[in-house]
Amino acid sequence: MVAAGLVAGAAAAAAWFGAVPASLDDPAPAGPDLATPVAQLPDDTATDVCGSTIDVTRPRTERTFDAFYTTRREVLGITIVAGPDVESAAVDVAEVTLRRVFAGNDLEDRLAEAGAYIIVAEPDQGVLDLPEFGCLEDELGTRFFTHVCGIADRAENPVATVNALDLLGDRSGPCNGVNILYHEVGHLVHGWAVDPPDYFESRLLYSDALKAGLYDRQYASTNFREYFAEGTQAYFDAQDREGERNRTWLEHYDPALYELLRAIYGD
């Protein structure tokens, strides 16, 4: 997610990466309606999202992580990694988040097969400081990333990152203490794990929601990917710091999206 006023290239990047702005209340320009991402196996030897390639004929091998990540914890087949300055409590929250999202479904199996993993960034780390994403500075510049507090869904590389402070509920975190991992996992689920009919249904519901005047100047209006991810955030937690835009709110505000998410994730 990005703040309003960014250049078109940055808006497009936000749509592609599933980035989250430092302020959840900031509106964002609509991003492009990109082609459906195909859930394919990533290159397990790639160390950054710019150099990754896909070879679906190659037998799957164990993913190799950068040596910086001294913490590695597997949860439901999905690996959580973190650097040395990340408190174990933050990794615990990431684990609880994953277990909650996948408690009523088996979507984690598809993500695990794709090699998806979660990065918990250190408190003072920005996106470009992480081994996987540093290469994006040349591609997108630094300005875009000053507005980003979480990122996911590089099409060739199912990886998401959030800051440890936000997982711990610390208001000094990039997302002001909101556990934005629900949003970022929503991107991974949407791009890699949902069935095609549900994927296309989300596009139709997004269009219907905009026609009905929903999500005016809210980040969910950016594109159908952010619509799904923001819905996921509300379904499991809340979109806002006050906790008001939660599952109950979603059920009444956008019942069609609520029912789709309930069918995908379970109760």
What are these regions (language model features)?
Residues 16-39:
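Ser/Thr-rich, Pro/Gly/Ala-heavy low-complexity intrinsically disordered linkers and tails
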Residues 31-38, 45-63, 238-267:
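A cross-kingdom marker for long, charged
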Residues 43-44, 223:
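Processing junctions and N-termini across compartments
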Residues 51, 65-70, 75-78, 87-203:
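Acidic/His-rich structured neighborhood in mature extracellular/periplasmic domains
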Residues 2-15:
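Hydrophobic membrane-insertion alpha-helices, especially the h-region
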Residues 24, 105-108, 195-196, 241-242, ...:
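Surface-exposed helix-capping loop/turn segments at secondary-structure junctions
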Residues 18, 140-161, 171, 175, ...:
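Metalloprotease/metallohydrolase-associated module, dominated by Zn2+-dependent proteases
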